[in-house]
Design a protein with these regions (language model features):
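Juxtamembrane helix-start motifs in multi-pass secondary transporters
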Residues: 33-34, 94, 179-180, 240
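Hydrophobic alpha-helical transmembrane segments in multi-pass integral membrane proteins
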Residues: 43-54, 105-120, 159-177, 220-237, ...
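Membrane-interface interhelical linkers
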Residues: 1-89, 137-152, 174, 185-234, ...
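Hydrophobic core positions of alpha-helical segments in small-molecule transporters
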Residues: 9, 36-37, 70, 97-100, ...
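Juxtamembrane helix-loop boundary signature in multi-pass membrane transporters
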Residues: 1-9, 100-158, 162, 168, ...
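Helical transmembrane-bundle signal
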Residues: 14, 42-46, 128-131, 157-160, ...
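MFS transmembrane alpha-helix packing/gate-lining sites
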Residues: 13, 74, 101, 159, ...
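Alpha-helical transmembrane segments of compact multi-pass small-molecule transporters, enriched
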Residues: 41-45, 97-111, 186-190, 224-227, ...
Length: 283
C-alpha cells in the first residue's frame, strides 16, 4: 500500500478513537490513572501489529538507541502533560491549539529531515489549518480561556510535533510493531512515577471504566498509530502527518451523518471539503 492509503487508514482509526475517547474521558475521575491503564493495555496489545507488518529491528547502532531514548522520553512527556492540558483548557480551545502540532511537525520535517518542499504541500497544510479554524473558531465565543491551559496546550502541541519527528526517524530501525510497544510503554512509566500513582487510584478508574472498554479504545488508537508509522516508512513526514492527524472534520461528518448534528451545517460541510482538497493536493 502507498503512504497515502496508509495515512487515510490511520486517520479513519484515529477518528473512531477520538469519538470513543471523548465519551470515556467524561467518566474518568483521575486522568493520570486513566492514562496508566490505557497506555499499558495498548502496549500489551502492540504485538497485534505484527499481523500486518513483520518488520523486525535492524541496524541498531548507538546513534539509533540515543535517538530512540530521546523520542520515548518525549512520548512519555506527552502522556504526562496531556492531563494538565485538558484539565485547564476547554475542549473548543484545546482542539484549535493542538492542531499547531501537525503544522510544526510539517516545518520541522522540512528543516531537520531535509524533506522536499512543494507548493502543493504548503497549500494542503494551509487548507487543513483553515478547515479546523473555520470549524472550531465559532466555539471560542463562549469559551473561557485559561492562560495556564493555553500554555500547557501549546507545550503539548510542541511535544507532539517533536515526537512525530522522532517517529519518522526511529520506526525505520525498529519496525512498526516493536516501536509501537515502546511508544505506549513510555507514557506508562512517566505517568506512574511522576508523581507516583497509587493502586487504589487505578482500582477506582477500573470501576468507573471496565477493562474491556480500555482495550477497545486502545485497539483503534494502536491500529491507527501502526498505519501512521508504516506510512512514515514509505512517505515523507511532511506529507503523512498533516493527513494522518486531520481527524476533526471527519469526526464532524460522523456527527452529521450518524448523530444528526445539523447545527452550523454549511460550515461543517465546507471545512470537510477543504480537508478533502488538501488530501488530494498532498497525495
Amino acid at each position: 500500500m502507498s503512504w497515502l492509503i496508509l495515512s487515510l487508514l490511520a486517520v479513519s482509526f484515529f477518528v473512531i478513537y477520538d469519538v470513543a475517547g471523548r465519551y470515556l474521558a467524561t467518566r474518568s475521575e483521575n486522568p493520570q490513572a486513566f492514562a496508566v491503564i490505557y497506555n499499558l493495555g495498548v502496549a500489551l496489545m502492540s504485538p497485534l501489529i505484527f499481523l500486518f507488518d513483520q518488520t523486525i529491528p535492524s541496524d541498531i547502532t548507538p546513534y539509533v538507541i540515543f535517538m530512540t531514548v530521546l523520542g520515548l522520553v518525549i512520548w512519555g512527556l506527552n502522556g504526562r502533560f496531556e492531563y494538565f492540558a485538558k484539565k485547564h483548557t476547554e475542549a473548543s480551545v484545546f482542539s484549535i491549539i493542538i492542531k499547531l502540532g501537525p503544522v510544526m511537525s510539517f516545518f520541522l520535517a522540512l528543516i531537520i529531515l531535509g524533506e522536499t518542499f512543494t507548493l502543493s504541500k504548503l497549500a494542503g497544510v494551509i487548507l487543513i489549518v483553515t478547515a479546523n479554524i473555520i470549524l472550531l473558531a465559532g466555539n471560542l465565543r463562549h469559551a473561557k480561556i485559561d492562560p495556564k491551559g493555553v500554555r500547557y496546550t501549546l507545550l503539548l502541541a510542541l511535544i507532539l510535533s517533536v515526537a512525530w519527528l522522532f517517529d519518522a526517524v526511529n520506526v525505520k530501525a525498529w519496525g512498526v510493531g516493536v516501536f509501537c510497544m515502546f511508544s505506549f510503554f513510555a507514557p506508562v512509566i512517566m505517568s506512574s512515577f511522576f508523581p507516583t500513582i497509587k493502586k487504589k487510584q487505578l482500582v477506582r478508574e477500573l470501576k468507573l471504566t471496565p477493562w474491556w472498554q480500555f482495550l477497545v479504545l486502545g485497539f483503534f488508537n494502536l491500529i491507527g498509530y501502526g498505519f501512521m508509522l508504516k506510512a512514515l516508512t514509505l512517505g515523507e513526514a511532511s506529507n503523512v502527518m498533516p493527513i494522518a492527524t486531520s481527524t476533526t472534520p471527519f469526526v464532524v461528518l460522523i456527527g452529521i451523518l450518524l448523530l444528526g448534528e445539523r447545527d452550523s451545517l454549511a460550515r461543517k460541510i465546507f471545512s470537510s471539503i477543504l480537508v478533502l482538497i488538501a488530501i488530494y493536493l498532498m497525495r
